[in-house]
Design a protein with these regions (language model features):
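Hydrophobic transmembrane-helix bundles of small-molecule transporters
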Residues: 171-269
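Transmembrane-helix bundle of Major Facilitator Superfamily
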Residues: 2-195
Length: 269
């Protein structure tokens, strides 16, 4: 019994942030925290952004495009982690996210900000699955539950802290600093991961389901476009509204049929 307790204590000590693998876990948590906070941090900054850039009718896209780009790119990058390794994809994801943050910070119009938010979302789509894969690689099955608790706490804290941080930046600095603050933090996470994390890549043969990715991306985009702009740019019962929503729904149905037919599924492991 005493030996079992001692083993549990050693196991707990080996998965903490102060352990040998702690810097890698810290980098993963920081990366995940950045993409999680950016999903909510704009909530309290919207009035200031609209006041500077205009485009009040388009501001919902700041949230939708980020989540859409992330959702579409997650399965793609998850496949690439098996092709070229976790470390390159994680660094690419952080790089895309940081580049998108810089461009968001210097955005000159609402359409430009929306486009750059999509770039952020692509980076987030690489970070999210790769972070969990790295954890699975460096921790045993017995250790993963505790480590996943660390990562889950990041998501929970980010949901609460995000809007608060957005309000602080708007009140005391400028809404652009919501994005600029990601640059040094993302750079530090990438540097730490580059130095501390090493892997032996075992290349596996995977076919990237481009057809599924296109159908999902275009179909979901059209549905979101129809829902966001319906009643604003066109009436709900107008031809554009019905056509956009119908085409989007048909593409999503086609996506479902394609995935049933494929041997290598876009949303599969």
């Amino acid at each position: 019994m005493a030996q079992s307790t001692e083993q549990q204590s050693v196991s707990r000590a080996s998965v903490g942030l102060r352990s040998e693998r702690g810097p890698i876990l810290g980098s993963v948590m920081l990366s995940v925290g950045l993409i999680a906070i950016d999903a909510t941090i704009l909530a309290t900054a919207v009035p200031s952004i609209v006041n500077d850039l205009g485009g009040f009718a388009q501001f919902p896209w700041l949230f939708s495009i980020y989540l859409l780009a992330q959702a579409v790119s997650v399965p793609i990058f998850a496949k690439f982690t098996d092709l070229i390794g976790r470390k390159p994809i994680m660094l690419i994801g952080i790089g895309l996210f940081v580049l998108g943050s810089i461009l968001c910070g210097i955005a000159w119009s609402m359409p430009a900000l929306i486009a750059f938010r999509a770039l952020q979302g692509l980076g987030a789509g690489a970070v999210q699955p790769t972070a969990m894969t790295i954890i699975g690689d460096i921790y045993s099955v017995a250790e993963r539950a505790r480590v996943q608790g660390y990562v889950a706490s990041v998501w929970a804290i980010s949901a609460v802290v995000g809007p608060t941080l957005g309000g602080i930046f708007v009140d005391y600095l400028n809404w652009r600093w919501i994005f600029f603050v990601n640059v040094p933090l993302g750079a530090f996470a990438a540097w730490s991961l580059y130095r501390r994390f090493s892997e032996k890549v075992v290349r596996r043969q995977h076919r990237i389901d481009v057809e599924g990715a296109v159908l999902l991306g275009v179909g979901a985009s059209l549905i979101i476009l129809g829902l966001l702009e319906g009643g604003i740019l066109w009436a709900w019962d107008s031809v554009p509204s019905i056509a956009i929503l119908s085409v989007g729904a048909l593409l999503m149905i086609a996506f479902g049929f394609v995935e049933r037919r494929e041997n290598v599924v876009f949303l599969g492991p």
